[in-house]
Amino acid sequence: MSERCRCKYSSGASIDYMPTSTQAKMVSKRIAQETFDAAVRENIEEFAMGPDEAVKEAVEQFESQGVDLSNIVKTAPKVSADGSQEPTHDILQTLSDLQESVASSRPQEVSAYLTRFCDQCKQDKACRFLAAQKGAYPIIFTAWKLATAGDQGLLLQSLNALSVLTDGQPDLLDTQGLQLLVATLTRNADEADLTCSGIRCVRHACLKHEQNRQDLVKAGVLPLLTGAITHHGHHADVVREACCALRVMTFDDDIRVPFGHAHNHAKMIVQENKGLKVLIEATKAFLDNPGILSELCGTLSRLAIRNEFCQEVVDLGGLSILVSLLADCNDHQMGDQSSVQELVKQVLSILRAIAGNDDVKDAIVRAGGTESIVAAMTQHLTSPQVCEQSCAALCFLALRKPDNSRIIVEGGGAVAALQAMKAHPQKAGVQKQACMLIRNLVAHSQAFSKPILDLGAEALIMQARSAHRDCEDVAKAALRDLGCHVELRELWTGQRGNLAP
């Protein structure tokens, strides 16, 4: 790029500074879409570049200045067919056409423009961002209200457009939209496609937005979500979306609020809406679909937050289903390798969650859970996620349970854990959970120390301790309980300040 072009960018671009979520001291530079478009237009008009070259030069120049262009539409604005309008981006032209057709109450045109709007927004998140900046939400909301008069096809397209627009932009949903969303789901509970799209809107509106979560829960969305799983129990897309939405309701991911209602929402799903029963029953319709089973198991693990909820999973027959699923995965009876590994990880996650109840620990062992967990870790040794979850589940089963520790060791659990440590030396999660498992196995059963040490445990634990800072405490605890020499340091001695006697 010429020196002249560089000077124009550096003098003409209005750059804002926005803090990122990950680096407190670093800042991310951002520009407006108009600034980028002006730079592209200058390249075309003053330097005789073609549209593609002009965009490429603008991108390179702004990025060289550290500008974040993730929310910028990186195409040259187009001139309208008749040349009567200023050049604009496709998404803004579609938005303008949609607004005109909505204002004129022409449903067929509205439908066509909504479809085009969805297609364009799906191609690039920058299109969604630009559309939102230019007033897309009130236009879609008006189309949505127009569709509620009874046009099911237009209603579905309106919900699809809303779900695409709110993906990553949950602040767009206002009080009116929230109320209309709940009303739409209530009135169309029998329609699978409408229910699926509406629930997707709920999920997008609630992700990283605590206020929307609380407002939707108060408006009665939880029974609509569990009811959708019950009513459309054989419709995979509805079940998947409903599970995702239920999980989002239990998240505490909004950094703008000091604390959320995740725990209360999980309790409400279980106690007021029979969430555990609904999810466990739903698994029976998808025993040959590892993708949906993963969603169901992942949601169950988010709800097993209390001692009695863990026991309820067992009482409802959930434990036998989980152990059977794990055995089927180990026997290669379902799906491709990646989907099977994801299902195994989710089954292990829920087993780990419900093993927080001491009575459930024993029930899992009696049901053959330890053998299935060890087999899963051995079968999927190349997956660090499966190894980590396997060690974590066995760790919970061994906690305060010497008899369970014996069964785990005799079943090859210690061997499998050490193999996992060898296979994934750089994975802190695997190393940490394996150290915790070994510690729990020998904490109340010193007889297992020598056999485990003979397998090379000390060297592996020392390696984990030196490689991963997070493993320091658990590694020392494991070495101590194995009978190895560990140098313990006093972090606070009370020798200085007011703590001294």
Swiss-Prot record:
Q: Which residues carry this modification: Pros-methylhistidine?
A: H263
Q: Which InterPro entries match?
A: ARM-like (IPR011989), ARM-type_fold (IPR016024), Armadillo (IPR000225)
Which sequence positions carry the modification called Phosphoserine? S64
Q: Where are the ARM repeats?
A: 220-264, 274-318, 319-369, 370-412
After translation, how is this protein modified? Methylated at His-263 by METTL9.
* Any one GO BP annotation for this protein: hematopoietic progenitor cell differentiation
Membrane-crossing residue ranges in chain numbering: none
Q: Which UniProt keywords apply?
A: Methylation, Phosphoprotein, Repeat
User: Which superkingdom heads the taxonomic lineage of this protein's source?
Assistant: Eukaryota
Cystine pairs: none
- State the family it belongs to: Belongs to the ARMC6 family.
- Name of the featured protein: Armadillo repeat-containing protein 6
Gene coding for it: ARMC6
